[in-house]
Amino acid sequence: MRILLIFCYFLIFTLCFSCGESPNKKEENNAKEIDASELKNQKTADRKVILFFGTSLTAGMGLDPNEAFPAVIQEKIDSLNLPYEVVNAGLSGETTAGGKNRINWVLNQKVAVFVLELGANDGLRGVPLTETKSNLQAIIDVVKEKNADTKIVLVGMEIPPNMGEAYTSEFRNIFPDLAKKNKLELVPFLLQNVGGIKELNQPDGIHPTAEGQKILANNVWKVLKPVISK
């Protein structure tokens, strides 16, 4: 009888201990999951936005979004543990006029760095150079008005000589002129070492392949890295 009582006490103690332990472990695991989720959200919230505003070259037309040069730059940023989040606002076929019309909508978030890549489609369509330059200036003005602390990187472009030597030359000069006037960082030529190289472009001969996009990323990174490392 005594042995039976001892066994019963042992059984009750074991059951009570077991029943009390499971909820604690469950709560502990839930707390850990919540903490991890909050930490991830906090890290995202703490990251400053780099907004890439451009054409199909920025959007990565014909490729997976992760192969576009802004995404490649995000990988470079992450490898250095820099607190920045890339937002790709590239749009295929975008002109400076189109960019001017949508800039206010795009700037509905706080932007630390604004990378402006527009003008190529204007040049290919023969848009008057004064109009292209005016539209780019208007976009720059809006960015500065929204937040004077936003750093702006202007991406230079060149076009084939189809429109004539004078037009081509003046088009090229738009970007350094605007960069100097507004004290912006300038990427001299986005398609450097990619434009006109068959194996680095898709069949249309205009849009870079994934390998070409990596070179574009390097071209931009040379200018962008010092800006976000300060």
Specify the residue positions occupied by each region the protein language model found:
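Active-site metal-binding loops of divalent metal-dependent hydrolases
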Residues: T55-S56, A120
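A short beta-strand-loop structural module common to alpha/beta enzyme folds
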Residues: L82-T95
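Short hydrophobic segments within beta-strands
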Residues: F53-G54, V155
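N-terminal secretory targeting modules
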Residues: M1-F53, A59-D64, D78-P83, Q109, ...
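Alpha-helical cap/lid subdomain in secreted, periplasmic
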Residues: K100-K230
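Short catalytic helix/loop segments, enriched in acidic residues and glycine
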Residues: E67-S79
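A generic secondary-structure micro-motif detector
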Residues: R2-L5, L63, S92, L129, ...
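Conserved Rossmann-like nucleotide-binding pocket used by diverse enzymes
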Residues: L15, V87, V153
